[in-house]
């Protein structure tokens, strides 16, 4: 075999080994983002660091109605995990959007339908809740005990 071909093959193998250590990204977050846009007018990034429960993790008492939407969504995902093999952050699902109406179309009782229903309820809740800019990017250690 040509030495140049061996070098290319080696480079491909090394890059594949490196890629094997990259954790998979949550797949349904793109769907959830699109669902949020379907239900309301705020960009999804407005919710990433909002209050005590919006974004990763969550603790303490929700600061307002919007933060309660995120807490409820977290609890809904916790319930979805009881399906055994249901991992909400990685479970994709089918739905339709006819602004502002969202319809989940996976089979009732399935993991996908349950996760879709969680995301749908949260998106509708987000759209209905007032947004308090003072609750964005707060110090969670100070305000969320």
From Swiss-Prot:
Residues 20-27 form a propeptide. Its main location: secreted. Disulfide bonds join 38-97, 52-144, 54-70, 69-125, 76-118, 86-111, 104-116. It catalyses: a 1,2-diacyl-sn-glycero-3-phosphocholine + H2O = a 1-acyl-sn-glycero-3-phosphocholine + a fatty acid + H(+). CDD domains: PLA2c (cd00125). The keyword Calcium applies. GO terms for biological process: arachidonate secretion; fatty acid biosynthetic process; lipid catabolic process; phospholipid metabolic process; positive regulation of fibroblast proliferation. PROSITE patterns: PA2_ASP, PA2_HIS. Its cofactor is Ca(2+). The keyword DNA damage does not apply. It is an enzyme of class 3 (hydrolase). GO terms for molecular function: calcium ion binding; calcium-dependent phospholipase A2 activity; phospholipid binding; signaling receptor binding; toxin activity. Residues 1-19 form the signal peptide. The active site is at residues 73, 119. Keywords: Calcium, Disulfide bond, Hydrolase, Lipid degradation, Lipid metabolism, Metal-binding, Neurotoxin, Presynaptic neurotoxin, Secreted, Signal, Toxin. It is found in: Secreted. Ca(2+) binds at residues 53, 55, 57, 74. GO terms for cellular component: extracellular region. Binds 1 Ca(2+) ion. Its EC number is 3.1.1.4. Snake venom phospholipase A2 (PLA2) that has only a weak enzymatic activity. Inhibits neuromuscular transmission by blocking acetylcholine release from the nerve termini. PLA2 catalyzes the calcium-dependent hydrolysis of the 2-acyl groups in 3-sn-phosphoglycerides. PANTHER family: PHOSPHOLIPASE A2, PHOSPHOLIPASE A2 FAMILY MEMBER. Belongs to the phospholipase A2 family. Group I subfamily. D49 sub-subfamily. This is Basic phospholipase A2 Vb-2. It comes from Bungarus fasciatus (Banded krait).
